[in-house]
Regions:
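Conserved N-proximal alpha/beta basic substrate-recognition cap immediately N-terminal to
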Residues: 6-18, 27-192, 196-199
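Short, surface-exposed charged micro-motifs
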Residues: 302, 367-369
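PAS/PAS-like sensory domains
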Residues: 19, 283, 361-364
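Extreme N-terminal starter segment of soluble prokaryotic enzymes
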Residues: 1-2
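Phosphate-binding site of ATP-dependent enzymes
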Residues: 205-324
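C-terminal active-site "lid" helix and adjoining low-complexity regulatory extension at the edge
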Residues: 325-363, 370-426
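C-terminal or late-domain output modules
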Residues: 18-22, 54-69, 315-358
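Short, flexible loop/turn elements at secondary-structure junctions
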Residues: 7-8, 34, 192, 219, ...
Length: 426
């Protein structure tokens, strides 16, 4: 297994620990930062192979070195160095401008930063420096990884295909794919044409009689850029619950940041500023579906799917409309949250169908919300890196232990029906 991520972070360390606990040889860990600094995938791989050449490569009698390489991309989100490099890669004067994996490449980024300026960005707690340019750079990095893997690792398999990861990361494209596949999702505000700013959002909410919506930054994570927004159709009064904080300045544009906690806004100036900023970078609005509750609190389910099997699941319980573990939502098992086995089976089936809409990918965390009225399941998000779940077991295994057991060489060599595909075969 070749993991491309951030060496030593919780994800790559969790994978290595799981492999060690199972008696498997360590994975090869390649660094996003070094790749973005200009080193080739081949050079990075050669260095790591030399360091691991003395390690045994046999597991359960299988020579793992004889298996086709399995490429796993991890989240780049825990490193500001990587974030800054991706913003630079997304610059209009960047050298590598392969936008083939960007779902909306033709849409210009607002006030783009040149490469030199991007490299000078300073880390500021929670600040969202340039989300749309970051995403453009991310898609360019994915395209480069895909190209170089074809050359360096012929016959390799992607656990999650880079094109699918790009699509999952952009909520606009992900929800479109799910809808086209017949997967139930919250109804978009403007199915043919999404709003483009605060004014068009309010106009569409009133004309479609959808007075409560969730507005999302298309490529936000950890609840950043999410707004639970209500508009009174008669008085025009409005309320926005969001993690977005604002710092205003006299001589330069405001700074928007993820405050890490929910804030309540009722003044039009602040609300319109936040919403306009989100739509400039890429926004998505959908019907606000009241979630099923437990002891007066709302919850949804993060359901992990690994190679067409729904496994680990956790209920994210909150006293607010926004349920996210980064907001310190209470964690429960679905049973503890009061879900019947029938509803749990519906959640699992919905999650399986959601990942099947991305047939070149094998692992994702699916956020499933259950309507408090009809108890119908809806897919709110498909997270290609949604397997970082602590203290959740399935058949006695943690998430990474389960994935490593399923992804042994024997599994993906002898079961061609799995979503794992050969690099370049799509």
């Amino acid at each position: 297994m070749i993991v491309i991520g951030i060496p030593g972070d919780k994800r790559t360390s969790g994978i290595q620990q799981a492999r060690s606990d199972l008696g498997m040889p360590p994975a090869i860990i390649l660094s996003y930062a070094e790749f973005l600094q200009g080193q080739s995938l081949g050079d990075l791989l050669e260095v790591q192979k030399q360091q691991l050449s003395s390690q045994p490569a046999v597991y359960n009698g299988i020579d793992l070195s004889a298996a086709p390489p399995l490429l796993r991309l991890e989240s780049p989100g825990s490193s500001f160095e990587v974030e800054r490099a991706l913003i630079a890669l997304g610059a209009p004067d960047a050298v590598d401008v392969d936008d083939s994996l960007h779902p909306y490449a033709e849409r210009p980024d607002p006030r783009p930063l040149r490469v030199k300026v991007a490299h000078q960005l300073k880390e500021m707690q929670g600040v969202l420096h340039h989300p749309s340019q970051w995403f453009r750079g991310y898609c360019r990095m994915l395209a480069r990884l895909q190209r170089e893997a074809k050359e360096v690792c012929p016959g390799s398999l992607w656990l999650n295909d880079p094109a699918d990861i790009a699509a999952m990361t952009d909520k606009r494209r992900a929800q479109q794919i799910l809808s086209e596949a017949g997967i139930p999702i919250p109804r978009p505000l403007g199915e043919e044409q999404q709003p483009t700013d605060y004014a068009s959002l309010r106009e569409m909410m009133i004309s479609r009689r959808m007075h409560r919506v969730f507005i999302k930054l298309a490529f936000g994570s950890a609840a950043s850029g999410v707004i639970a927004y209500q508009l009174h159709p008669v008085t025009g009064a409005e309320v926005a619950l969001t993690t977005v904080g604002v710092e205003n300045y006299i001589t330069r544009p405001p700074i928007y940041y993820n405050s890490g906690k929910l804030r309540r806004y009722t003044d039009t100036a602040t609300i319109s500023g936040i919403i306009n900023w989100i739509y400039r970078h890429g926004g998505y609005a959908e019907q606000w579906i009241p979630k099923i509750g437990h002891n007066g609190k709302a919850f949804d389910i993060r359901q992990l799917v690994v190679l067409r099997e729904a496994c680990h699941a956790i209920a994210r319980v909150s006293s607010t409309p926004i349920t996210n573990l980064h907001l310190r939502s209470q964690r429960m098992s679905p049973s503890e949250a009061g879900l019947s086995e029938f509803i749990q089976e519906q959640v699992r089936n919905t999650a399986l169908q959601a990942l099947a809409a991305f047939p070149r990918s094998g692992v994702a965390g699916i956020d499933v919300l259950i309507s408090g009225g009809s108890q119908q399941c809806f897919v709110a998000d498909v997270n290609p890196f949604g397997d970082l779940l602590y203290d959740v077991k399935y058949r006695g295994c943690s998430t990474y232990e389960w994935e490593m057991k399923v992804l042994t060489a024997r599994d993906y060599i002898t079961h061609p029906s799995t979503p794992l595909i050969k690099e370049g075969s799509s």
